[in-house]
């Protein structure tokens, strides 16, 4: 059964309705950013249905009442000692408890999670997944993962619901073949993912006997209408841009306040949600130094810096109220000045003269014989120069020197 969900509310209601129709009060989930985007877990919990994450990192985040901080490794901000404490204190309330003698050895932590999840896999009647790709020519859905939990969710329960963003659709298996090689190399550095699962509807007597596919819009058609921003829909969620970004490296994923962190989140979230309504969303296009490293590593060549600049312009436009602000007036003045060479030359001469006057009034000598301008009276300038020294202006401007020496060709030795 194929469903269309215009927004998050419709998507959550479709999944909840399937769960209610089968009389279940819990489901198991494959790691899916689309379900996080629509806040599916919270919506199901409001209707008395528990949604259990089965990806190890997502399980850690869920048991710790935390939020993911990375697209590929959601619990990267947790060390193994913290994970041990989460398992020991929280696992029992969600199902099979962790062993009393659990240590922080990775092998033991993985074994505790495996035993805890196995009971849920065997008990669950309904599973929810996303999809990395959907093949239009056959209706096949594809999930790539590394732990095997996805395959358990896709084969053991009687009912499977897959929530898929409409941008995940590729035309043919030939197109899919390209992405199956591209994604693992860009995300984990592997030639292929350990588990690649594909399913095309129901196979009698094998796997889920009822399959629902929910095609999710939730702002994607609006993004498609944006000629600059639409390239963000090419994202395959490899997280290469996060790993290269100096801003993400220093702030972490939680600082973005978004399901999608990092450079891709800085453009995807404002595109999906729109700007001008939420201060946190409006701040995301500015969470970048525009260094371009994200563009260099992106396997699908999303020009993230260009989209960031595009979104910054949209944020500015969204907050205009008809009255020019100080920044607007300053930018208009700068455009008027720098847009004409003669005006700029006059301004340089006037500025040089003013600087000389101020320099004479406030000049002071720094160690090493260098001169600088000390405190300047007046609004604005006094606040800046009270704690900072400004370099003393040269007696001759660059433009004047260039004209006099023909670019240095006639300069005396």
What are these regions (language model features)?
Residues 55, 79, 105, 172, ...:
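Secondary-structure junction/capping motif
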Residues 1-228:
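The feature marks the mature, well-folded catalytic cores of soluble enzymes
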Residues 168, 233-237:
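Short, contiguous, pocket-lining structural segments
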Residues 1, 14-26, 42-46, 183-204, ...:
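Iron-sulfur (Fe-S) cluster-binding modules
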Residues 206-232, 242-243, 247-367:
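Ferredoxin-type iron-sulfur electron-transfer modules in oxidoreductases and energy-metabolism complexes
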Residues 10, 193-205, 237, 248-252, ...:
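A glycine-rich phosphate-binding loop feature that marks nucleotide/adenosyl-phosphate handling sites
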Residues 41, 174-177, 181, 239, ...:
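Predominant activation on well-ordered alpha-helical scaffold segments within soluble catalytic domains
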């Amino acid at each position: 059964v194929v469903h269309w969900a215009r927004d998050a509310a419709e998507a959550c209601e479709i999944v909840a309705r399937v769960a209610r129709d089968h009389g279940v009060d819990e489901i198991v989930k494959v790691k899916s950013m689309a379900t996080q985007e629509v806040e599916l877990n919270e919506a199901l919990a409001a209707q008395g249905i528990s949604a259990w994450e089965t990806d190890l990192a997502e399980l850690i985040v869920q048991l710790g009442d935390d939020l993911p901080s990375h697209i590929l490794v959601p619990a990267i901000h947790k060390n193994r000692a913290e994970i041990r404490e989460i398992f020991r204190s929280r696992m029992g309330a969600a199902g099979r408890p962790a062993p009393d003698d659990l240590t922080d050895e990775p092998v033991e932590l993985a074994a505790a999670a495996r035993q805890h999840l196995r009971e849920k896999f065997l008990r669950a009647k309904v599973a929810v997944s996303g999809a990395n790709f959907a093949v239009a020519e056959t209706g096949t859905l594809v999930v790539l993962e590394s732990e095997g939990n996805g395959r358990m969710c896709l084969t053991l329960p009687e009912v499977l619901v897959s929530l898929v963003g409409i941008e995940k659709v590729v035309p043919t298996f030939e197109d899919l073949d390209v992405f199956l090689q591209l994604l693992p190399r860009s995300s984990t550095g592997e030639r292929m993912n350990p588990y690649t699962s594909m399913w095309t509807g129901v196979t009698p007597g094998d796997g889920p006997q009822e399959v629902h596919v929910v095609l999710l819009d939730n702002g994607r058609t609006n993004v498609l209408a944006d000629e600059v921003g639409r390239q963000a829909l090419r994202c395959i969620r490899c997280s290469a841009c996060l790993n290269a970004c100096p801003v993400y490296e220093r702030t972490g994923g939680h600082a973005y306040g978004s399901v999608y962190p990092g450079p891709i989140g800085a453009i995807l979230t404002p595109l999906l949600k729109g700007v001008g309504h939420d201060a946190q969303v409006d701040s995301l296009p500015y969470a970048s130094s525009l260094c371009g490293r994200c563009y260099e590593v992106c396997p699908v060549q999303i020009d993230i810096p260009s989209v960031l600049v595009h979104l910054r312009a949209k944020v500015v436009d969204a907050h205009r109220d008809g009255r020019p602000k100080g920044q607007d007036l300053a930018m208009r003045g700068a455009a008027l000045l720098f847009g004409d060479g003669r005006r700029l030359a006059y301004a340089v001469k006037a500025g040089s003269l003013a600087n000389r006057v101020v320099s004479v009034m406030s000049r002071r000598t720094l160690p090493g014989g260098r001169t600088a301008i000390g405190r300047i009276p007046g609004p604005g300038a006094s606040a800046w120069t009270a704690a900072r020294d400004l370099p003393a202006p040269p007696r001759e401007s660059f433009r004047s020197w260039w004209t006099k020496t023909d670019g240095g060709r006639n300069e005396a030795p």
